[in-house]
Amino acid sequence: MSITTHLDIVSAEHEIFSGVVEMVVATGELGEIGITPGHAPLLTVLRPGEVRITLQGGTQDIYYVQGGMLEVQPHCVTILADVAERAEHLDEAAALAAKAKAEAAIASKGGDIDYSVAAAELARAVAQIRAIQKTRKKMK
């Protein structure tokens, strides 16, 4: 029997996942962080990106979060996400369109463009596309 910890992924709308996992990998403020049972207590900001969870038995699921907080306690990991979805439920066409729109806004030389907003939109779109691509690889 493998060593596990409890994970809750919750968005403002509803609970996305609640169950026992062997490992959680998320994109924190300083990069990817891997959490296994027995990890030291931690509180960090999440950046838009994927959350990979390894269930008992080694099966992996991929979720997309659009920022939020990750808390690690001795026997529980909690992700409070601004927005969270299973990666397979993401709309690839919409993500590609959002990426193209953000890139066009950044490339334009107009004075009425808020570059920080465009950069954040670009980061979200790229994170969604990566999550979709990893889900595709997992399904093959």
Swiss-Prot record:
Assembly description: F-type ATPases have 2 components, CF(1) - the catalytic core - and CF(0) - the membrane proton channel. CF(1) has five subunits: alpha(3), beta(3), gamma(1), delta(1), epsilon(1). CF(0) has three main subunits: a, b and c.
Entry keywords, A to Z: ATP synthesis, Cell inner membrane, Cell membrane, CF(1), Hydrogen ion transport, Ion transport, Membrane, Transport
Domain of life, source organism: Bacteria
Provenance organism: Legionella pneumophila subsp. pneumophila (strain Philadelphia 1 / ATCC 33152 / DSM 7513)
Lineage: Bacteria, Pseudomonadati, Pseudomonadota, Gammaproteobacteria, Legionellales
Function (record text): Produces ATP from ADP in the presence of a proton gradient across the membrane.
Pfam families: ATP-synt_DE (PF00401), ATP-synt_DE_N (PF02823)
CDD domains according to UniProt: F1-ATPase_delta (cd12152)
Protein name: ATP synthase epsilon chain
GO cellular component entries: plasma membrane; proton-transporting ATP synthase complex
HAMAP family, per database record: ATP_synth_epsil_bac (MF_00530)
NCBIfam families registered for this protein in UniProt: ATP_synt_epsi, PRK00571.1-4
Major subcellular location class: membrane
